[in-house]
Amino acid sequence: SGWTDTPTPMLRNPDLVAGLEYAAYPSLEAYMTIEDTTEGRVYAANPYFHQVDTAGNQLPYIDYQNERYINENEIRLLKLVNGEVDYKSQSVQLESAPQLLDGAESGGYSLQINPGCGAALFSFNVTHPDMEKRKVYSDIRFRQAMSIALDRNEINDVAYYGMGVVEQFVGISPAPDFVPDAIKTHMTQYDPDGANALLDEVGLKDVDGDGFRELPNGAAFAMNIDYATQGIGGVEVELVARMWNDVGVKTSFKEVTPDEYRGSQSSNALDVHAWDKGQPLAIIAGNPETFKAPFGNYFNHTQGMLWGAYIDSDGSDGVEPPQWVYDLSDGIDKFQSYELGTAESNEWGEKITTMLTEQTLLIGTVKAPFPTYHRNALKNFTQFKT
C-alpha cells in the first residue's frame, strides 16, 4: 500500500468538491478560472504558480484576463476597430485586415500579419446519415473532382490578397522535406473540365436540366457548408461554394457559431466540414490524431466520425472504415517509433503523408498568414513568428 491507494480529499468528497468556487480548486496552471458564463470567462493569476522569470519575478505578469464571447463577426470587428479589445488572434481572418489596418491609428492598436501553421480545409462527410450522399462522398472520384474544381489562385487573390501559397493538405505543416513535391500539390490544379468528367463518372447527372446534378438514384442533390469564422473566412467559403456550383454541384453556405459548428460536426450532421488545420512535425511526432480516424478532435477539423466510433468500439458501433484507414493508423505508429530525422522516420513520414494526401479526404486550398491584433497600451508585446 502507498500514497496512490489513498484518495485525495477532492477524490474522497466529490459532493463537497462540486460546490467549490473555481478559485478554490488547487491548480498548477498559470491562471485560474474565477468566472464562467455564457458571455465569457474571467481568469485570475494563480498566486501559487510555481514559475518565475529569469529575474526572479513571479509569473504570470498579468493579474486578470477577461475573455468575452462575441460570435457575430461584424460586431467583433467593430469592437476591434474601436480599440475595445486588448488582444485578439483567434477568429481574426486576413480578409478583415484592410479594415483593421485603416482603423489602427484612431483605434490605438497595432496589427501583425504573421505566417500561420494551419490552413483552411474542406472535406465531405464520408459517414453521412443519408446513405446516397455517403456513397457519393465516399467515392474518391467525387473528392478529386471537388478539389480540382477549385481555382486556388483566385481564392488566394480574392480572399488572401495574393499573400498565401497554394498547397494541398499533407497532414504536417509546414511540409517536411520527406514529403514529395508532387504530393504537396496533389489535385490542386484548376481543371473544371476534368472535374465535370469525374462527376459524370460518379453518376451525378443533371437529369432535369436545371443546371445542377442529381444523385445517382435521381434524387435531388444539394450540399450546405456550415462555417464559423473562428475556423475559416467567409470570403473563401463563398468562393468555394460558387466554384462547386459552377460544376453543377448545388452548394449553399451559412455562418454559424463555433459551438454550433462543433456540435454538428461531432454529431455527424454536416455535409461539408470546413475548418483550418495544421500541426508541425514536432507535434505529429507525439500526437497521432491527424492520421487516425476521425483525424482530429472536437476543437478542430475532423472527418469520418463513424469510422472513429467503429474503431474505438471494436466494431460494435459506427461504420467500418476502408482498409487504407487501418494502414494509415499503423503507419503513423511506425513513424512515431523512430527518431525524427532518421532514414526510417523519413521513409515512414513519406508513406503516411502520401497515403493521406492521395485519398483526397482533407482538401487543402491556400495557406495564408493570419492577423494578430493588440492594443498599443499592452506593453512589451513581441513580434510573433507564427
Give short role names for the model-derived ranges.
Residues 1-59, 64, 74, 191-201:
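Gly/Pro-rich hinge or "lid" segments in bacterial periplasmic/extracellular proteins
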Residues 18-19, 49-99, 241, 248-252, ...:
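Ligand-site clamp/hinge motif
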Residues 25, 31, 35, 39-41, ...:
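Detector for C-terminal structural segments
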Residues 34-44, 68-130, 153-159, 166, ...:
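Extracellular/periplasmic solute-recognition and catalytic clefts
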Residues 46-48, 81, 119-141, 158, ...:
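A bilobed periplasmic-binding-protein/Venus flytrap-type ligand-binding module shared by bacterial periplasmic
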Residues 60-64, 174-178, 214-228:
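Short, conserved helix/loop micro-motifs enriched in His/Cys and acidic residues
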Residues 76, 81-91, 106-107, 240-243, ...:
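Alpha-to-beta junction loops
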Residues 208-211:
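Acidic, glycine-anchored loop motifs typical of Ca2+
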